[in-house]
Swiss-Prot record:
It catalyses: 5-amino-1-(5-phospho-beta-D-ribosyl)imidazole + S-adenosyl-L-methionine = 4-amino-2-methyl-5-(phosphooxymethyl)pyrimidine + CO + 5'-deoxyadenosine + formate + L-methionine + 3 H(+). The keyword Cell membrane does not apply. Pathway: Cofactor biosynthesis; thiamine diphosphate biosynthesis. InterPro entries: ThiC, ThiC/Bza_core_dom, ThiC/BzaA/B. Homodimer. HAMAP family: ThiC (MF_00089). One of its GO terms (molecular function) is 4 iron, 4 sulfur cluster binding. This is Phosphomethylpyrimidine synthase. NCBIfam families: PRK09284.1 (NF006763), PRK13352.1 (NF009895), thiC (TIGR00190). [4Fe-4S] cluster binds at residues 422, 425, 430.
Amino acid sequence: MRSLWVEKRKDDPVKTQMYYAKQGIITQEMEYVAKIEKLSPELIRSEIARGRLIIPANVNHTTLEPMAIGIAATCKINANIGSSAIASDVQGEVEKMQVSQHYKADTAMDLSTGGDLDEIRKAVIASSKIPIGTVPIYQILHDVGNKIEDLSIEVMLEVLERQAKQGVSYFTIHAGFLLETMPKIAKRKMGIVSRGGSLMAAWMMHYHRENPFYTAYDEILDICARYDVALSLGDSLRPGCLADASDDAQLGELKVLGELTLRAWEKNVQVMIEGPGHVPLNQIERNMKLQRELCHEAPFYILGPLVTDIAAGYDHISSAIGAAVGGWHGASMLCYVTPKEHLGLPNANDVREGIIAYKIAAHAADIARGRKGARDIDDEMSDARYRFDWNRQFELALDSERAREYHDETLPQDVFKEAEFCSMCGPKFCSYKITQSIMDNPEAIEQIAREVKEREALGA
C-alpha cells in the first residue's frame, strides 16, 4: 500500500510526516489514520505540525499500515518482544510478532540482545504491518563485543543508520541522561533500572565524558530525518520502585527531554517521550501533567506504571491499573508489561496476556477521556449479554478465544450457545431472566409506582 506513496515522494528534500505537516501538506498516511481515528485529515496534519501527534512510519517499511500516537487519537499499546543472550530464536520472535498483531498491539519493539540481531529484526519487520521500534544501544553494545569501553560515536551512528535502512520506525534513544545527573542517583533505593540508562552511566563513568547520544544528537536527528524514524526519547532514570518515584533524577531528565524535543522538531523529526516506571497511584496524574508542561505536549509513552512492587507474576495487572490511570490523564501510548516482568523472558503466551491487559487499560482510558464512540462496543456487549447472544459476546470480547474457552469449560455443547443462562447461576437464578420477566409486565411496574406514591401521600 505505502510503496506508491513513498515512491512519489522519493525526490523530496525532506521525507518526514512532520515536514509535510508543517508545509500544510496532508499525506496519504495522514488521510489513512484520519479514517481510522474518525478525525479530519486537517486535524491530523495540524497535530503533527504542532508535535502533539506522530505517525511512526519509516519510508523503508512499505508494508506498514499507518497509525497515530497522540492525545487526539485513541490510546495505543506497544508490545515488547525480543531475544536474550540466554534464549535467542528468530522463529520464536516472529511467532511473538504474529501473536502481537493477532491480539491487536498497535506497535511492537524488538528488544533483542542475543543471537543474530540483524536477522531477527529483518524477520520481525518483514512479518509486521505495525510500526517496529528498537533500543539501538542493545545492538551497539552487541557489536562491540559487550565491551562498553569500545563504544564509540562512529559505531553508534553506523548502527542507527543500519537499523533505519532496515525499516525501524522509532528509536528509543537515551540522550537525556547527563553527567550532571549522576550524583542524584546515589540517593535512590534502586539506582538505574533502565538497561540503556545503566549502559550510558557505565560509559560516562569509564570516560568521564558526556553521554554520547547527547553529544551526537544532531547527527542522530539527521539519520532520523532521512528515513522518517521517530524518536522515542528514553527515560534512563525512570523509577524502578515506588520509593524512587517522582524524584529529582527522574524529573531532571524529563526537563532535558523537553529541550531535546524542541531540537528534534527544528529538524522535522517526530518525537514521543517515554515515562515511568513504578509510581504510586496518587502520583500518576501529577506525572502526566509534568510531562505535558516540560515536554511541550509531545505524546507521552508510558511503561505501566506499576502501582505496587509486590505483584511478581502478576505485574501485567499491577501495571495495567497504572496504565489506565495514566491513559485517562493524557498518556498517548502504553507499553505493556507481561506476567514475566522482573522474572524472565516472556514467551508467546505471556505476550498475549500482556497485550490483553493493556488493551483493557487503553480502552478504559478512552472511555474515561470521553472519546466519541469509545463506549459503543461496551453498549453492544451489554445488549448481547442481556439477549443471551453468546456468539456475539465472544466476537466483541477483546480476547474472543479466551471468552469462548471459558464458556466451553462447563457448557461445551453447541446447544448451550443458545441457552438463556450460564454455569454461574443456572436457569433458575439468572438475574437477567428474572429482570426480563419483570420488565415484560410494564403495567405491573406502573401499578407498583402508583401504590408507592399513594402510600407516600398518606404518610405526609
